C-alpha cells in the first residue's frame, strides 16, 4: 500500500514495538467527549454478563475517571495529556477509612483548582466522587486503578503517549490504519473499541466542519473480528448515517448470533441498514441458517399430472398445480458448496456465485501467502518515541 501512495498506520496490541501512537486525549474537544470516552472505557472493560443492582458504583467511578481526565485536558500542557499522567495522578489518591478529615495530595490538587475555578467541571466531578464514604471511596479507587492497569505496563503507556493516527485525515487522502489484536486474549481489545469510537467522531466532525457533511475521499471500515471488539454505544445510528458522510462499513461475523448477543433489540436494524449481505457458507448455527433461508424467499414449482384409464370407456385427464417451496432448504444452505457464496443486494434477487480465488489476485505475490516476507511496520513517530518503544 505504501508503494501505491498510501500513508500506513498500525495500532498493534500484539507487538507494541511495531505500533504507531494512539493517544485518546488528542481527540477530546469538549467535556462531552470526555464522558463519551469514559463511558466507552467502562463498558469495554466490564464483562458482558456482569450485572450490578446498584448503579452508584459505576457512576462514582465515572465521576472519578472523568475528573482525572478533565484536569490535564484543561490544565496541563499537551505532552502531559495522556493516560500515563492519569495513572500518575491516581497514585496520589488515598483514602483513610478511620480519618475522614485526611486530605491526600490529589485532594489538595483539586482543592487548589477549586479555589481558582470553583465551577470547573473537573472540580464538580471530583466532588461527586468524594461524596462516597471512606470505605466506599477506597473501593472505587481500587476499581478504577484495576480498570486502568493496562497503562501501568510501560510499552502500552508509551504507545498511548502521543498520537500519530489523525483519524480525520482518513477522509481526505490515501491512508490506511490497521488494528492488530491478539486472537487468544481480548483483555486489551477495549483500546480498539475506544479507537473506533473516536475515529467515527473525528470523521463526522471533519466532514461537518470542513467538507459540508461529506468527506471528499471515501472511507471504508473493514471490521474483521467485529464481535470481539466492543463497538461504540451509538453504532446502530452510525451504521444508519455513515453513508451520507461517504463512509462504508463492512461487518464480518461468524454467524447472526454474534450480532444478537451484542445488540439483542437492534440486531435486525443493523442487518437492515446493510445494503449488501454476503453469506460464505459453513457453520451449523440454526439461527443463521434459518435467517438465510427466509431471506432467500420461495420459488414456485409447476406440477403437471396426467391420468389415463384404458378400456371400452377409457378416459384421460391432465391436472396442473402450482406449489411453493423455499428457494433453498436449511439442509441445502448448510451443505452449500465451499467454493460458492450467496450474495444479497438490496432490491435485487439473490445471487449464487463462485467465490473469487484469492490465489489468483495479481497482488498475492506481495503477501505471505504468495511467499513474500512478513510486513514489519516501522513506527512513523518522532525518533525519541520510536526509541522508547524498543527499550
Describe the role of every protein-language-model region:
Residues 1-247, 262, 272, 323, ...:
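P-loop NTPase motor domains
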Residues 239-342:
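Conserved ATP-driven motor cores of ASCE-family P-loop NTPases powering translocation/secretion/packaging/pilus
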Amino acid at each position: 500500500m505504501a508503494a501505491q501512495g498510501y500513508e500506513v498506520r498500525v495500532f498493534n496490541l500484539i507487538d507494541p514495538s511495531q505500533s504507531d501512537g494512539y493517544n485518546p486525549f488528542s481527540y477530546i474537544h469538549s467535556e462531552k467527549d470526555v464522558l463519551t470516552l469514559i463511558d466507552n472505557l467502562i463498558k469495554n472493560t466490564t464483562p458482558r454478563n456482569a450485572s450490578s443492582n446498584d448503579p452508584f458504583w459505576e457512576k462514582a467511578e465515572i465521576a472519578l475517571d472523568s475528573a482525572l481526565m478533565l484536569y490535564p485536558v484543561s490544565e496541563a500542557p499537551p505532552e502531559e495529556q495522556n493516560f500515563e499522567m492519569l495513572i500518575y495522578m491516581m497514585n496520589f489518591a488515598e483514602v483513610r477509612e478511620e480519618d475522614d478529615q485526611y486530605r491526600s495530595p490529589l485532594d489538595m490538587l483539586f482543592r487548589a483548582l477549586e479555589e481558582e475555578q470553583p465551577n470547573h467541571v473537573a472540580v464538580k466531578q471530583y466532588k461527586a466522587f468524594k461524596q462516597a464514604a471512606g470505605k466506599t471511596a477506597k473501593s472505587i479507587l481500587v476499581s478504577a486503578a484495576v480498570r486502568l492497569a493496562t497503562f501501568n505496563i510501560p510499552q502500552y503507556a508509551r504507545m498511548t503517549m502521543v498520537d500519530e493516527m489523525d483519524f480525520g485525515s482518513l477522509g481526505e487522502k490515501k491512508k490506511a490504519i490497521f488494528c492488530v489484536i491478539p486472537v487468544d486474549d481480548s483483555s486489551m481489545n477495549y483500546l480498539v473499541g475506544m479507537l473506533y469510537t473516536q475515529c467515527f467522531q473525528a470523521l463526522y466532525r471533519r466532514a461537518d466542519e470542513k467538507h459540508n457533511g461529506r468527506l471528499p475521499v471515501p472511507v471504508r471500515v473493514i471490521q474483521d473480528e467485529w464481535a470481539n471488539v466492543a463497538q461504540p454505544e451509538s453504532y446502530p445510528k452510525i451504521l444508519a448515517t455513515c453513508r451520507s458522510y461517504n463512509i462504508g462499513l463492512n461487518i464480518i461475523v461468524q454467524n447472526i448470533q454474534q450480532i444478537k448477543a451484542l445488540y439483542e433489540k437492534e440486531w435486525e436494524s443493523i442487518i437492515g441498514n446493510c445494503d449488501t449481505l454476503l453469506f460464505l457458507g459453513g457453520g451449523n448455527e440454526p439461527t443463521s441458517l434459518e435467517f438465510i433461508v427466509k431471506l432467500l424467499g420461495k420459488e414456485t414449482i409447476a406440477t403437471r399430472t396426467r391420468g389415463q384409464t384404458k378400456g371400452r370407456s377409457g378416459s384421460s385427464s391432465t391436472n396442473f398445480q402450482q406449489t411453493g417451496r423455499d428457494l433453498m432448504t436449511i439442509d441445502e444452505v448448510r451443505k452449500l458448496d465451499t467454493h460458492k457464496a450467496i450474495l444479497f443486494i438490496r432490491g435485487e434477487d439473490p445471487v449464487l456465485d463462485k467465490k473469487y480465488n484469492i490465489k489468483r489476485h495479481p497482488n498475492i505475490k506481495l503477501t505471505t501467502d504468495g511467499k513474500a516476507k512478513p510486513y514489519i511496520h516501522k513506527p512513523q513517530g518522532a525518533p525519541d518515541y520510536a526509541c522508547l518503544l524498543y527499550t
